[in-house]
């Protein structure tokens, strides 16, 4: 059972215990004539007798260590280069300009033609030219002569410049045939009889050539509706 601790301690015990307590805790505010202080003193005395050692409550100065400011870690973000603009170089197919009254021949030359309103829109051959511009200019000159200021032209700003006529492409002349050379020789050095025969042969040759030219012109002059346009393909 719990036995109350006697609060009455002899002066000798108090005087012998005080050095121990004062060495541990320093000066204790305990008074001998105070009953409550004596109760506390009795508890401490019993504890020391039982082998209890008070904690070392001596205040120790703690040196404040300098605080290291830790910067937040930055994760390097790889810079992504903007995608290079892919220029799709598309092959530009050059398209020839379309000119009024001009069409391209299969072998690359350009033919100029015009329709004559006085002949119900019959096509009139103007010639073959090296470039489409020359053929278009030939058409402009013919159209201006036919219709005047009402003509629809390819180069209206050039009609009053008095430019020379575009140069036509002519077929290569054939080499003289043996018959023609013989006719010429007979006309110069032959007898009168041979000369008469040579003259007759020359007339026949000229007649054949004229018929051939007439057939060629007839093939070129075909009927077309009035207002139709010929364009370079």
From Swiss-Prot:
Source species, domain of life: Eukaryota
Keywords assigned by UniProt, alphabetized: Activator, DNA-binding, Ethylene signaling pathway, Nucleus, Plant defense, Transcription, Transcription regulation
Short name of any one Pfam family annotated for the protein: AP2
Keyword Transcription carried by entry: yes
Ranges annotated as biased composition (Low complexity): 177-186
GO terms for cellular component: nucleus
Residues annotated to bind DNA: 98-156
Record-linked InterPro entries: AP2/ERF_dom (IPR001471), AP2/ERF_dom_sf (IPR036955), DNA-bd_dom_sf (IPR016177), ERF_plant (IPR044808)
A single BP term in Gene Ontology: ethylene-activated signaling pathway
Domain remarks in the Swiss-Prot or TrEMBL record: The AP2/ERF domain binds specifically to the 5'-GCCGCC-3' motif. The affinity of this binding is higher if the seventh amino-acid of this domain is basic.
Protein name as annotated: Ethylene-responsive transcription factor 2
